[in-house]
Amino acid sequence: MTMDGKNKEEEQYLDLCKRIIDEGEFRPDRTGTGTLSLFAPPQLRFSLRDDTFPLLTTKKVFTRGIILELLWFLAGDTDANLLSEQGVKIWDGNGSREYLDKMGFKDRKVGDLGPVYGFQWRHFGAKYKTCDDDYTGQGIDQLKQVIHKLKTNPYDRRIIMSAWNPADFDKMALPPCHIFSQFYVSFPKEGEGSGKPRLSCLLYQRSCDMGLGVPFNIASYALLTRMIAKVVDMEPGEFIHTLGDAHVYKDHIDALKEQITRNPRPFPKLKIKRDVKDIDDFKLTDFEIEDYNPHPRIQMKMSV
């Protein structure tokens, strides 16, 4: 928030959506919907200080879905049914019988997405079989490595987590869109703030669905940064979002035009209610969103 009370951080998102609609190049895409696209627009930056949580206010965002999906990633899960049973249907399309058959996964059960995000974060390099197999101790646990480096060598320039594993693409229902995150610790000057170091996260996202996906991704990685900061005893700093192919699906244009006319309100606050020490101990009930006052929900169809 700026001194004049305007939410400039949400405005940067809305300005980019408008620019894509006005100036974007038409591109056909794998879903058959078609998009307007810009490549490598300016980064989006969001402060996470003072418990600020960059949850868009110009439409109501499915906060519970964001939290449950991230917990699902962190658990290394790849079974979309585990989310669907909790009312989070965002992966149902990519895990449907029709979609899996179309992708050549006729022997997989419905919901088995293959070695997607959570598997790569927690078991990079392990041999994937099914979503029901136990991969404990297999592959590289990138998330645990990130946390260890933050605790032992916070100046390290290799505090990185990647979901991009070309060796596994032929097993994935959908290759990752948000693929590469780097964490950076800054140290306060003497007498500044709480005195604790600040943790920031930079995300590179190759494919950026501005209408549906990007609002989710912003909040999800802001939440991830908050959770990691909690377990390493740091303060949250900033989330920086680097976008590759930033696109608006043609059937989202009218909805986004409506959203752009709305005035952003102050971002809510995110409170973590327990003193969690282990990244694997977080639960849905640990999080509380305060002062979220969004405009009404805007329906947009997901292209699969």
UniProtKB/Swiss-Prot annotation:
- Which pathway does this polypeptide act in? Pyrimidine metabolism; dTTP biosynthesis
What does the record give as EC number?
2.1.1.45
- Compartments, as annotated in UniProt: Nucleus
Cite the binding residues for (6R)-5,10-methylene-5,6,7,8-tetrahydrofolate: 209
Known regulation of activity: Inhibited by 5-fluoro-2'-deoxyuridine 5'-monophosphate (FdUMP).
Q: What is its main location?
A: nucleus
Name the InterPro entries for this protein.
Thymidate_synth/dCMP_Mease, Thymidate_synth/dCMP_Mease_dom, Thymidate_synth/dCMP_Mease_sf, Thymidylate_synthase, Thymidylate_synthase_AS
Task: Name one molecular function that GO assigns to this entry.
Answer: thymidylate synthase activity
Q: Which UniProt keywords apply?
A: Methyltransferase, Nucleotide biosynthesis, Nucleus, Transferase
Q: How does activity depend on pH?
A: Optimum pH is 6.8-7.2.
Q: Catalytic activity, per the record?
A: dUMP + (6R)-5,10-methylene-5,6,7,8-tetrahydrofolate = 7,8-dihydrofolate + dTMP
Q: Which residues are recorded as binding dUMP?
A: 30, 157-158, 206-209, 217, 247-249
What task does this protein carry out? Thymidylate synthase required for de novo biosynthesis of pyrimidine deoxyribonucleotides. Required for both nuclear and mitochondrial DNA synthesis.
Instruction: Tell me its family.
Output: Belongs to the thymidylate synthase family.
Question: What's the protein name?
Answer: Thymidylate synthase
